[in-house]
Design a protein with these regions (language model features):
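Boundary regions of SH3-family modules and the immediately adjacent low-complexity/disordered segments
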Residues: 22-37, 58-63, 75-114, 125-127, ...
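Short alpha-helix capping/helix-loop boundary micro-motifs
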Residues: 46-51, 121-131
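Long, low-complexity, intrinsically disordered segments
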Residues: 399-412
Length: 412
């Protein structure tokens, strides 16, 4: 009897201990997914016929309640519960990649402002097969931060059906029945031996430009270059001469009450003057721009004119816009703070850079910073007197005539 009482007491103690463990046990941590589609509808069951129980929009955080092979049962922040397709969501790891991308490039200088041509996704890295998350609407404004170029993913070639092989016709006088009884696993010998021709030349891969961009919500990601349009004033677009303007920056403004330019029926009196950077309409280039042009406003003729132009260079963004005094020359003009701009070009001693095979970034080794000051209708380079002009690289080799003309310009 005493042994039975002791066993009963031990059982009660163990039961109490287990109850205590359950009391102090922490609640299982929630799992989350994020909506990648523009909008999804929650359903009450996974079936061909179902009822809507709620909606969720792009980027919204959902709590995972249950899971099947292709669907997830979730709860929205508003308490709506239902099933969604798993392919329309991203996991926490993908969301963390985009958060880290935005934090890393939060203070990067803005190269240009662009708009989305259509509904398009932001990717975690350059490339069509990389993870995607945020979905942009047509016309969304973006700030471009960095360019990368990667090979385009080619679609898988369609299988080509081989035509049925026809047996060779029997020679004159040969046994017709013998030719017809040729075994199926034996092919007639070719009359001429097959000779291997010269090795086929493999064409270079087709490249695509991707831009790291940030939208108005602070969300960052990579977007395909051909899906955006750089914001350029209409008054400058006609001066592009078949080139693509990759950056247009306001140097300063001039007053012209008789400009003739209208905005909503009103005359624009404050006319901006620009420095622009242009490049060919081609992806995969080892530079961001190969031409620089400064447009100033002619107050007498009320139109834009070119005050400075440089071409055949390997230039890299971003550019720097500001004001400065001339530190090398005396006089009242030199002491005035006038508009200035700086940009970087590849040095002649540096190799032409190739895109990084992993990141797609183009990282030149040696760059030359060129600074100019706008003095009226003249752009003057800020270079200390007696300093030799550094030699620059060129996409197209200069002709002797161009070198001689540049030499005369330097001596002046």
């Amino acid at each position: 009897m005493a042994r039975f009482a002791a066993s009963l007491a031990l059982a009660v103690v163990c039961s109490g201990a287990l109850s205590g463990c359950n009391y102090f046990r922490q609640k299982a941590q929630d799992r989350y997914v994020y909506v990648t589609a523009r909008q999804v509808f929650l359903r009450d069951r996974v079936a061909a016929v179902s009822n809507r129980t709620g909606t969720a929009t792009n980027g919204e955080k959902l709590v995972v309640l249950d899971r099947t092979r292709r669907a997830i049962k979730v709860r929205t922040p508003r308490g709506e519960v239902g099933w969604v397709e798993e392919k329309l969501t991203a996991d926490q790891k993908t969301a963390d990649q985009f958060v880290a991308l935005a934090d890393t490039h939060q203070k990067d200088p803005v190269i240009a402002v662009a708009t989305a041509r259509d509904e398009v996704y932001l990717h975690a890295a350059p490339g069509r097969e990389t993870a995607r998350f945020y979905r942009l609407a047509e016309g969304d404004t973006l700030r471009l931060l960095e360019r990368a170029t990667v090979p385009k993913v080619a679609p898988a070639p369609a299988p080509v059906a081989k035509p049925a092989a026809k047996p060779d016709a029997p020679a004159v006088g040969a046994d017709k029945d013998a030719a017809e009884k040729l075994p199926e696993d034996k092919e007639p010998a070719s009359a001429t031996p097959v000779t291997s021709g010269p090795a086929a030349v493999v064409p270079p891969p087709v490249m695509e430009d991707w831009w790291l961009a940030r939208n108005g919500k602070g969300q960052a990601g990579w977007i395909l270059g051909r899906m955006i349009d750089v914001t350029v004033p209409d008054t400058l677009a006609r001066y592009a001469e078949g080139q693509r303007i990759v950056g247009a920056y306001v140097l300063h403004t001039v007053d012209d009450p008789e400009s003739g330019m209208l905005d909503n029926g009103k005359t624009v009196e404050q006319i901006p003057e620009y420095v622009t950077f242009l490049a060919p309409y081609k992806s995969g280039l080892p530079y961001d721009f190969d031409q620089v042009r400064v447009f100033i406003w002619n107050l007498k003729k009320h139109r834009y004119e070119t005050a400075f132009r440089e071409h055949n260079i390997l230039g890299y963004l971003p550019a720097t816009i500001g004001t400065m005094k001339d530190p090398y020359l005396p006089g009242a003009l030199a002491q005035m703070s006038l508009p200035s701009f700086s940009y970087r070009v590849l040095a002649a001693s540096a190799p032409i850079p190739a895109p990084d095979p992993v990141t797609g970034l183009v990282q030149p080794t040696t760059l030359i910073t060129k600074t100019y000051r706008l003095e009226g209708n003249i752009c003057r380079r800020m270079l200390q007197p007696g300093t030799p002009v550094p030699e620059e690289a060129h996409p197209v080799p200069e002709t002797p005539k161009e070198k001689a003309a540049k030499g005369r310009k330097k001596r002046k």
